[in-house]
Amino acid sequence: MFTLKKSLLLLFFLATINLSLCEQERNAEEERRDDDERNAEVEKRFLPFVGNLLKGLLGK
């Protein structure tokens, strides 16, 4: 019975570590994805502003 408890405890411990590592990796991936989306939003807002500014300066 003691051997069974040790085995189950070891399995539980390894599964907990595995889940923790997966969660950290998932969070890191979400942060990278959020940065990419944020950069795309900045480009969308910035490029029309520059275009309008150039049109105003060139008088077209």
From Swiss-Prot:
Signal sequence, start to end: 1-22
Entry GO CC: extracellular region
GO biological process, one term: defense response to fungus
Pfam (any one): FSAP_sig_propep
UniProt keyword Secreted present: yes
InterPro entries noted in UniProt: Frog_antimicrobial_propeptide
Propeptide segment residues: 23-43
The UniProt record lists the keyword Cell inner membrane: no
Keywords assigned: Amphibian defense peptide, Antibiotic, Antimicrobial, Cleavage on pair of basic residues, Cytolysis, Fungicide, Hemolysis, Secreted, Signal
Described function: Antimicrobial peptide active against a variety of Gram-positive and some Gram-negative bacterial strains. Has antifungal activity against a slime mold isolate. Has weak hemolytic activity against human erythrocytes.
Family statement drawn from the similarity comment of this UniProt entry: Belongs to the frog skin active peptide (FSAP) family. Temporin subfamily.
Protein name: Temporin-CG1
Organism: Amolops chunganensis
